[in-house]
């Protein structure tokens, strides 16, 4: 697991209070991990802070799964 992936997963576990084993690449923040829209916004803000990136709102709307978050951040950090 990449450093980015492990940091993303740690943020999700911390913010959503879910078990680390539930945070798999294909897990949806809302459908699988129980996040509501406010939780999702807070996750995006935490990703921005942790990785020192900006995620525009139109892009944030496309980040619905753990894997999508990891991919977006890996691309943004290149």
Curated annotation (Swiss-Prot):
Task: Enumerate the subcellular locations listed in this protein's record, separating them with semicolons.
Answer: Cytoplasm
Superkingdom of the source?
Answer: Bacteria
Q: Name the GO cellular-component terms.
A: cytosol; membrane
For this UniProt record, give its keywords in alphabetical order, as a comma-separated list.
Answer: Cytoplasm, Fatty acid biosynthesis, Fatty acid metabolism, Lipid biosynthesis, Lipid metabolism, Phosphopantetheine, Phosphoprotein
| Modified how | 4'-phosphopantetheine is transferred from CoA to a specific serine of apo-ACP by AcpS. This modification is essential for activity because fatty acids are bound in thioester linkage to the sulfhydryl of the prosthetic group.
The protein's annotated pathway: Lipid metabolism; fatty acid biosynthesis
Q: Which PROSITE patterns match?
A: CARRIER, PHOSPHOPANTETHEINE
> Does the keyword field hold Ion transport?
no
A molecular-function term among this protein's GO annotations: acyl carrier activity
Read off the Pfam families from this record.
PP-binding
Q: Which residues are in the Carrier domain? A: 2-77
Q: Name one GO biological process term.
A: lipid A biosynthetic process
Identify residues that carry O-(pantetheine 4'-phosphoryl)serine: 37
Xref: InterPro entries = ACP, ACP-like_sf, PP-bd_ACP, Ppantetheine_attach_site
What's this chain's function?
A: Carrier of the growing fatty acid chain in fatty acid biosynthesis.
Which PANTHER family does this chain map to? Answer: ACYL CARRIER PROTEIN, CARRIER DOMAIN-CONTAINING PROTEIN
UniProt lists the family membership as follows:
Belongs to the acyl carrier protein (ACP) family.
Q: NCBIfam families annotated for this entry? A: acyl_carrier (TIGR00517), PRK00982.1-2 (NF002148), PRK00982.1-3 (NF002149), PRK00982.1-4 (NF002150), PRK00982.1-5 (NF002151)
Protein's name according to its UniProt entry: Acyl carrier protein
Question: What's the source species for this entry?
Answer: Flavobacterium johnsoniae (strain ATCC 17061 / DSM 2064 / JCM 8514 / BCRC 14874 / CCUG 350202 / NBRC 14942 / NCIMB 11054 / UW101)
């Amino acid at each position: 697991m990449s450093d980015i992936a492990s940091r993303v997963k740690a943020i999700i576990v911390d913010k959503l209070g879910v078990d680390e084993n539930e945070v798999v690449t294909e897990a949806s923040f809302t459908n699988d991990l129980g996040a509501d829209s406010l939780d999702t916004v807070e996750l995006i803000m935490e990703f921005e802070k942790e990785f020192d990136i900006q995620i525009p709102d139109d892009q944030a709307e496309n980040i619905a799964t753990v894997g999508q978050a990891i991919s977006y951040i890996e691309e943004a950090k290149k």
